[in-house]
Amino acid sequence: MAKERAILHCDMNCFYASCEMAYHPELRDKPIAVCGDPERWSGIVLTASYPAKRMGVKTGMPLWEAQQHCRDITFVPAHYDLYTRFSGYTREIFLRYTDQVEPFGLDEAWLDCTASQSLFGTGEEIAKKISDTVKDELGITCSVGVSWNKTMAKLGSDYKKPDAITVINRQNFEKIVFPLPASDLLYVGKKTAAKLDNYAIHTIGDLAKTRPQFLQEKLGKVGLLLWRFANGLDSDPVAKYEQREVLAPIKSIGNSWTTPRDLKTDQDVWIVLYLLAESVAARLRENHFRCRGVEVSLRDSNLFIFERQMKLSLPTMQEQEIATAAFTLYKKHYHWSEHLRSIGVRAIDLQPDTEPCQISFDFSAEKQEEMERLESAIDGVRNRFGYYSVQRAVMYKDRLLSHCDARADHTIHPHGYLQGSI
């Protein structure tokens, strides 16, 4: 019989606010809210500290409303370089216990500690070690769920906050999980929760006890998936951190980002696509490749993922051409049933930059060489003086979305159960 898995889900508590308080001890135990631009009252709260939350301040709340709830609140501008650095520190701690670490944004990650138990103790004991280490070394807290699969582990980390460990096993999961709202389950967004409500399915227990055929009829294949999750049937593996075959040839180069707020307009999407295309193009040049195709992946606020790709008329390593192709795919295939939460851009069908290619009549080798020299020069400036030393004008249209070094902040996202479902 296979050994029962020990899966952990670690969730940093009020992550942005916690990083600010760790970096600025004078803010500790005070009501603070991290926001994009404190000078703009049209801005929103990205994260609030627990003292602010107790006063009614919530994520996504306009700043003027947050101040009505909490008169002495301190608004702090977001510092994504700081949060990325802290995120890297947490992952270094996780990797002391297992190489199977699957990040979920900057502040969450799954760990498979099954094989680590002989060295470090039970899953619960490892969770305690990680929690204590994060607190001692970084000055922030995390909540950890321990279970036999990823779904239950995530429900465990959400169950008690802050600074808590919750074990959900096969013996107690119905008692703990079944009374929880169905919306707490992974992949149940607002629209899906509303549909379930219409069928008197209000809790995870209700979902688990509903006939799977009925759920499939009403929700499609996601209905069966949710039924399995509600019943603890999740065998999805935890990916190895930055898993790659070192000796294998590079077949594609990509970057993805979970944005600090939902993307609601074409301009939002263009800014993020261009940001990612810059990173992908720079890595193509660094590795001496051109790409003959571009792939875009979109994840909406319900966590559904779909991917589309297209061939290019000519191989390229230019960010403008990659961004334009990605935006074309997005415009053609995405119809805004939900806001977007994450975007990925990938250069595919690679060829060495020394390989000759067939050109068209309107192709200008001189113009291509000029653009490639320009972008290589920008790479050199950024390598010496930092990413933000040179930026495109489009990046100043929304600093909240564009203030990210996509190469440094690259995040691995979990495997999409619902690839191609949109």
Labelled PLM ranges:
Residues 109-115, 307-310, 352, 357-363:
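Short, hydrophobic beta-strand segments
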Residues 9, 192-340:
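DNA-contacting surface of Y-family translesion DNA polymerases
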Residues 1-228, 238, 282, 365-422:
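Gly/Gly-Pro- and Ser/Thr-rich, intrinsically disordered tail segments characteristic of DNA damage-repair
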Residues 28-30, 71, 140, 290-294, ...:
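A generic structural signal for short beta-strands and their flanking turns/coil linkers
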Residues 36, 298-302, 349:
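Short acidic, glycine-rich loop/turn motifs
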